[in-house]
């Protein structure tokens, strides 16, 4: 693939050992795809599949009235255009949504006619509420803020078998249970109790013997026994009986009597164990029946009812034990054949038979009544109610739905194949088979299920969650419609009279606004956005809760491989419950996570890629991505490391079915951005992955010198950068927009051949960081589709750049880097390397109060002239003003209640209508501790209220900008069209034209240049077809002009109409402040390997350790932070970063060399750097100009990529270091022979340190834990109500907690007065603290400590236990 426009400018050298077989898929595909299927907006009505909105509608409609004479049918639905676009919704605080209209049909039947006849049909479109739309980057704008719907990992519907691990019963006996979980409907559980009786329960209610359920589905005791047991057949004789001999049932049993063959020879003596030889002898003797004594039958259980054939009298019932009297009665009635249940103690337990004994119901009706009584205790069981309840439990499609997934899981677990064939409700067979499998488990055959296996957990994505909410809304509507349908005929109602869209809107609004899975988007940087959208949570409605989730659920499971990242998960109570999707993972049609593998055909690894789910994967042997292959794609080694069904093993290549796609396939996006991840301890890698998401975008992003090669994918997929939608020529570039004239071959006929990209300028993100886009193309550049045109926050030339490359020295420095503290050079701060811009939004509203409206004005009494200077005539601050704490941003006055008026004054007021004369100043001021620059002001005015000048000027600006966009489009379209017309006209003969063009003359370029272009249309061509083309061109141009005018009008209408504001609000003004935050002590910083710390001191450059050539270190870290934490990746990163910088320096030296051979030398050096190891780069493709541009971009360091688990080896790092620092340079810089360490000098004394120091470049981040946001000082502030102690935290203006351990410290030093002060007057001694204040006022510095309030609370709590506790003062 050729390099794209931006890739050419700076090629990342990759150390990967293998080519990519498959590119990383689009990272937001899951979210976008899911919502697309939910809406199916672009799909034609006829082609819509039964999913999403369509499925919700079809499952509820048709709605039939109670009497069946009217029904409401669903025809189709359509989504309208949203009124405002995303940006406008964010500004106005609206939801980005489009109106949903459903076409429904009301059918009324004729009551007079006996057979159903349609009387009339009414069809109508009905508004069904607003459906939020997803933005192109996979988020939603709800009430003006961006939100993300996180996918949920929940237990898949289906049937699951498990046991209690011996925890229930004291003996440690395993109690097996089964559970049928539907997508929606009642849960059905089956469970054994310690006595081996099998029970069932519905929705965790009271348990009942399982045979009640079997009888309720129409089985008799005989059929139940026939289903679960094999029978032994006997024929009674006058003494004893003959028994059918089945050899396998006798093996290992004790003979209770002598067993003889036909000749009467004893083969097995009494009380001997029967073995295989005995059975062989019996079989060879041709024995089919053996005679057994009478007592052998006693205690056996009858399989069928025994009935006297003559009288029809029942002698014994099925499941009765055989006794002497039963046998006598049978002989008397001449019933000699009998069948008993075959059971044994080992693997044929009599469980169902025992259960049947405990069951007291007689027949199907009694069983159903028993179930009714359990479900609805206290209600009288009428026949209809009992019948209806039982049907609704598991057999009605309205109340019970297994879903396709559930049906597939039930089928596959019960051994009926892996497809979703069958009804979506439970069937009798399902229930029977489930019980059968459970009994087999108790008998010791089969395996229980692992509920943490990813084949038993599925992902519910946005679309599915939204569909469930929509359906819930529709169900509420259905109830209301049913009520009204009865009146539809008499009152001549239309469909829109029947349907009220409120419940639907409410359900949708509630889900998107306040569901646990709808979260405020984490927008700190592009990575945090992308990770948030790829997150998979086990929490939420229908999921787990933090408190109940055990260790197993949170643990890493073998099936997570390639599906869920084993590294990235939060620390703390949510660990393991919130996960991130792996890099290549995607969802299959059933919602299970699947991961790609390369298929192996005839021992060769092919390019065919198959996606396998966790269930499918268990059938195959899968090799790892780093297995060595030869040129043909065959395995080199005799034994290959593989995985099969979650176990790792070594096996011969012949047995291997699949191979991993890439080494990075097992980790998530954030983890795959950590270079040398394979050398880091997993706990630290987890911190590293999580902390990258908190990196604050710096003022000037800088690409990481050592990356992993996935930075570009992340930056582009996150939507932070601007990508070209179509290729073309850059026509115009400024800071706000990029205009591209599209290539002819990519332009669709009839469309405008212009793409205008408006860039986002200084916009506030959800986390108050700054989102700003900068163009990286120049006018006249040729770009292709997909090229990066502009960088966003934290991206550098289309690559993710979260931090800065810092020169790091690992050495202690006077205790300033003790315990993870960080020592930083002043130069870093002076160069604004870690300066970030944060944008604060301050809002003020003018309300209509009882005493009159509040007013936004400049006319405020007692305001200093310096304050007023910043406000314009409307009382709103100018853009660009620098403000600090307590400065007025918007002047506002509120009428204030008068003191009591005399009746005369009241009367005068009433007559002359004078409003309250007194007003108080309630202006918007800058909060304490904030300084910044005003960068934007937005004014929203209610409909019907006159706009002030400021609001009008803002609208005019906006319109001017829009007009300019339209003019640009028009200019390019017209130029393009006139170019074509010119080609058409030149050289053609004419019948006449402007400027007295004679008939028969030919048109020349010079002639056309003299005319105004619109006069060209007046030329009358003699050739008829060409004249038609000219006419069409004119019409198309005029039509375009008309379209642009319409668009402008539309925009103007939108801007000039009043804004929707909350009730009682007349005006709302938002002021945006840009706050510059420089790095300062107390800020948290971190590398990408979990090596975090807090800045302890910013040291002057001249005091920092420096190298022999005078280069000073930027950051000094403590070397003790590495060994115990086992994140050695940071050391390797430092070495490779050192090499990258050195190579860049060598290229810079070459560029300064102004000789002719310059390009040749640079080419040769670049070839050496890029193409000696790793996947290589195609330097030869580049022209000389491109090579020079590339070299200029590499001066500050050659970017390296060391992909996860496939990165640079030690030898490669050494080789790069040698390329970067030839002997003469190494000698000059006093590097050690390995080039990985250098001799440093103390900046303060100039002395050499006594041993060489590891030094190099690391990509270091500033995290979103800034001391400015955390530090505050409490004077007297709020106290907690009960304990009367100061509150904690900055928001509450709280104090510092003086806790248990701090008290111990004071006690240890015997500082009793300080201790007393801390625990009383500085905390919760109410009288004491007021007293101290008084004393200070009087100038008397004495403390009178009293009783702390918390002690009184303790006394009161003890009293609440009815213990009277009093203090005796002595």
From Swiss-Prot:
It catalyses: RNA(n) + a ribonucleoside 5'-triphosphate = RNA(n+1) + diphosphate. GO terms for molecular function: DNA binding; DNA-directed RNA polymerase activity; ribonucleoside binding. The keyword Transcription applies. Gene3D superfamilies: 2.40.50.100, 2.40.50.150, 3.90.1100.10, 6.10.140.1670, DNA-directed RNA polymerase, beta subunit, external 1 domain, DNA-directed RNA polymerase, subunit 2, domain 6, RNA polymerase alpha subunit dimerisation domain, RNA polymerase Rpb2, domain 2. The RNAP catalytic core consists of 2 alpha, 1 beta, 1 beta' and 1 omega subunit. When a sigma factor is associated with the core the holoenzyme is formed, which can initiate transcription. DNA-dependent RNA polymerase catalyzes the transcription of DNA into RNA using the four ribonucleoside triphosphates as substrates. PANTHER family: DNA-DIRECTED RNA POLYMERASE I SUBUNIT 2 (PTHR20856). This is DNA-directed RNA polymerase subunit beta. It comes from Bordetella avium (strain 197N). The gene is rpoB.
């Amino acid at each position: 693939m050729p390099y794209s426009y931006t890739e050419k400018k700076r090629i990342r050298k990759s150390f990967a050992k293998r080519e990519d077989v498959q590119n990383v898929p689009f990272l937001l595909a899951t979210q976008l795809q899911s919502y697309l299927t939910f809406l199916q907006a672009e799909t034609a009505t006829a082609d819509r599949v039964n999913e999403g909105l369509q499925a919700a509608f079809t499952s509820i409609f048709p709605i039939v009235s109670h009497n069946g004479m009217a029904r409401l049918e669903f025809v189709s639905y359509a989504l309208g255009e949203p009124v405002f676009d995303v940006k406008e919704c964010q500004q106005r605080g609206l939801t980005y949504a489009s109106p949903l209209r459903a076409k429904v049909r009301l059918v009324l039947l004729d009551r007079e006619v006996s057979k159903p006849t349609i009387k009339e049909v009414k069809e109508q479109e009905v508004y069904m509420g607003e459906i939020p739309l997803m933005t192109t980057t996979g988020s939603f704008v709800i009430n003006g803020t961006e939100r993300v719907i996180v996918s949920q990992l929940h237990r898949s519907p289906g049937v699951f078998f498990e046991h209690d691990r011996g925890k229930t019963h004291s003996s440690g006996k395993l109690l097996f249970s089964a559970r049928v979980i539907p997508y929606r409907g009642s849960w059905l559980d089956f469970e054994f109790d310690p006595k081996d009786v099998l029970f069932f329960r519905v929705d965790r209610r009271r348990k009942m013997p399982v045979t009640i359920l079997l009888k309720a589905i129409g089985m008799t005791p005989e059929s139940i026994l026939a289903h679960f047991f094999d029978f032994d057949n006997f024929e009674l004789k006058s003494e004893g009986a003959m028994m059918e001999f089945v050899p396998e049932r006798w093996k290992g049993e004790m003979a209770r009597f002598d067993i003889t063959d036909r000749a009467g020879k004893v083969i097995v003596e009494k009380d001997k164990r029967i073995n295989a030889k005995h059975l062989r002898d019996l079989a060879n003797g041709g024995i089919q029946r053996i005679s057994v004594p009478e007592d052998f039958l006693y205690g056996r259980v009858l399989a069928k009812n025994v009935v006297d054939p003559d009288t029809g009298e029942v002698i014994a019932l099925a499941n009765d034990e055989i006794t002497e009297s039963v046998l006598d009665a049978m002989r008397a009635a001449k019933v000699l054949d009998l069948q008993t249940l075959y059971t044994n103690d080992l693997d044929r337990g009599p469980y169902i038979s025992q259960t049947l004994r405990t069951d007291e119901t007689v027949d199907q009706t009694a069983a159903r009544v028993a179930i009714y009584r359990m479900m609805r205790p206290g209600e009288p069981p009428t026949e209809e109610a009992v019948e209806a309840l039982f049907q609704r439990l598991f057999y009605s499609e309205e109340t019970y739905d297994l879903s396709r997934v559930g049906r597939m899981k039930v089928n596959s677990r019960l051994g009926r194949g892996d497809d979703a064939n069958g009804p979506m409700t439970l069937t009798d067979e399902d229930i029977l088979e489930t019980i059968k499998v459970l009994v087999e488990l108790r008998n010791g055959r089969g395996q229980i299920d692992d509920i943490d296996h990813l084949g038993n957990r599925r992902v519910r994505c946005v679309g599915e969650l939204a569909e469930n909410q929509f359906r819930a809304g529709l169900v509420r509507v259905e109830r209301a419609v049913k009520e009204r349908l009865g009146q539809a005929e008499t009152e001549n109602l239309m469909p829109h009279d029947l349907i009220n869209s409120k419940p639907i809107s409410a359900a949708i609004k509630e889900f998107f606004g306040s569901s646990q899975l709808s979260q405020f988007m984490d927008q700190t940087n592009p990575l945090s956005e992308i990770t948030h959208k790829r997150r998979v949570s086990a929490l939420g409605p229908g999921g787990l809760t933090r408190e109940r989730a055990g260790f197993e659920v949170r643990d890493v499971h073998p099936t997570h491989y390639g599906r869920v990242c084993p590294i990235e998960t939060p620390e703390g109570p949510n660990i393991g419950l919130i996960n991130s999707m792996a890099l290549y993972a995607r969802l299959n049609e059933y919602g299970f996570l699947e991961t790609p593998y390369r298929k192996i055909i005839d021992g060769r690894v092919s390019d065919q890629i198959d996606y396998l789910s966790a269930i499918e994967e268990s059938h195959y042997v899968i090799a790892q991505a780093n297995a060595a292959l030869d040129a043909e794609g065959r395995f080199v080694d005799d034994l290959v490391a593989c995985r099969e069904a979650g176990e790792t093993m070594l096996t011969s290549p012949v047995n291997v079915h699949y191979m991993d796609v890439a080494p990075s396939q097992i980790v998530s996006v954030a983890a795959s951005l950590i270079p040398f991840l394979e050398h880091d301890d997993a706990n630290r890698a987890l911190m590293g992955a999580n902390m990258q998401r908190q990196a604050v975008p710096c003022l000037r992003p800088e690409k990481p010198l050592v990356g992993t090669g996935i930075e570009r994918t992340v930056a582009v997929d996150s939507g932070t950068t601007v990508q070209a939608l179509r290729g073309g020529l850059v026509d115009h570039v400024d800071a706000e927009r990029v205009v591209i004239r599209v290539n002819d071959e990519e332009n669709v006929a009839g469309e405008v051949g212009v793409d205008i990209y408006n860039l986002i300028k200084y916009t506030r993100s959800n986390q108050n960081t700054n989102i700003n886009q900068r163009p990286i193309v120049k006018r006249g550049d040729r770009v292709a589709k997909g090229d990066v045109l502009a960088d966003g926050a934290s991206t550098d030339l289309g690559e993710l750049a979260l931090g800065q490359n810092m020169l790091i020295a690992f050495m202690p420095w006077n205790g300033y880097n003790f315990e993870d503290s960080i020592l930083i050079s002043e130069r870093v701060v002076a160069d604004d390397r870690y300066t970030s811009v944060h944008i604060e939004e301050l809002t003020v509203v003018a309300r209509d109060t009882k005493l009159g409206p509040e007013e936004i004005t400049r006319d405020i009494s007692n305001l200093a002239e310096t304050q007023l200077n910043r406000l314009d005539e409307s009382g709103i601050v100018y853009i660009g003003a620098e403000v600090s704490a307590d400065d007025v941003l918007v002047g506002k006055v509120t009428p204030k209640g008068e003191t009591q008026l005399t009746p005369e004054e009241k009367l005068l007021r009433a007559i002359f209508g004078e409003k309250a004369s007194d007003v108080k100043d309630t202006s918007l001021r800058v909060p304490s501790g904030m300084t910044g620059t005003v960068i934007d002001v937005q004014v929203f005015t209610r409909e019907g209220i006159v706009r002030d000048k400021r609001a009008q000027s803002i609208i005019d600006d906006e319109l001017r900008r829009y007009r300019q966009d339209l003019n640009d489009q028009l200019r390019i379209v017209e130029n393009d069209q006139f170019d074509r017309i010119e080609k058409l006209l030149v050289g053609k003969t004419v019948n006449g034209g402007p400027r007295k063009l004679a008939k028969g003359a030919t048109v020349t370029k010079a002639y056309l240049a003299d005319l105004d272009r619109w006069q060209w249309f007046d030329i009358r061509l003699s050739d008829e077809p060409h004249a038609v083309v000219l006419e069409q061109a004119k019409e198309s141009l005029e039509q375009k002009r008309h379209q642009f005018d319409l668009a402008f009008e539309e925009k103007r209408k939108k801007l000039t109409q009043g804004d929707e504001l909350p009730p009682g609000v007349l005006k709302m003004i938002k002021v945006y402040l840009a706050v510059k935050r420089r790095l300062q002590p107390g800020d948290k910083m971190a590398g990408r390997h979990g090596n975090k710390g807090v800045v302890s001191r910013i040291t002057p450059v001249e005091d920092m350790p420096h190298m022999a050539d005078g280069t000073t270190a930027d950051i000094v870290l403590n070397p003790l932070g590495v060994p115990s934490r086992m994140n050695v990746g940071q050391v390797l990163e430092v070495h490779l970063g050192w090499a990258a910088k050195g190579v860049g320096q060598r290229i810079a030296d070459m560029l300064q060399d102004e000789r002719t051979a310059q390009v040749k030398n640079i080419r040769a050096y670049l070839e050496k750097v890029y193409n000696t190891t790793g996947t290589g780069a195609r330097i030869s493709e580049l022209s000389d100009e491109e090579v020079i541009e590339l070299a200029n971009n590499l001066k500050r360091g050659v970017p390296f990529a060391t992909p996860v688990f496939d990165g640079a080896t030690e030898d490669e790092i050494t080789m790069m270091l040698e390329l970067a620092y030839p002997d003469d340079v190494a000698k000059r810089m006093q590097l050690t022979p390995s080039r990985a360490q250098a001799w440093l000098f103390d900046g303060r004394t100039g002395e050499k340190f006594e041993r060489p120091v590891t030094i190099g470049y690391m990509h270091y981040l500033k995290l979103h834990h800034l001391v400015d946001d955390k530090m505050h000082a409490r004077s007297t502030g709020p106290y907690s109500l009960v304990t009367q102690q100061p509150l904690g935290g900055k928001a509450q203006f709280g104090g510092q907690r003086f806790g248990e351990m701090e008290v111990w410290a004071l006690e240890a030093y015997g500082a009793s007065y300080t201790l007393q002060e801390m625990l009383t007057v500085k905390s919760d001694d109410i009288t004491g603290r007021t007293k101290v204040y008084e004393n200070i006022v009087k100038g008397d510095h004495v403390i009178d400590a009293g009783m702390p309030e918390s002690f009184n609370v303790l006394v009161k709590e003890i009293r609440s236990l009815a213990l009277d506790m009093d203090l005796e003062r002595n």
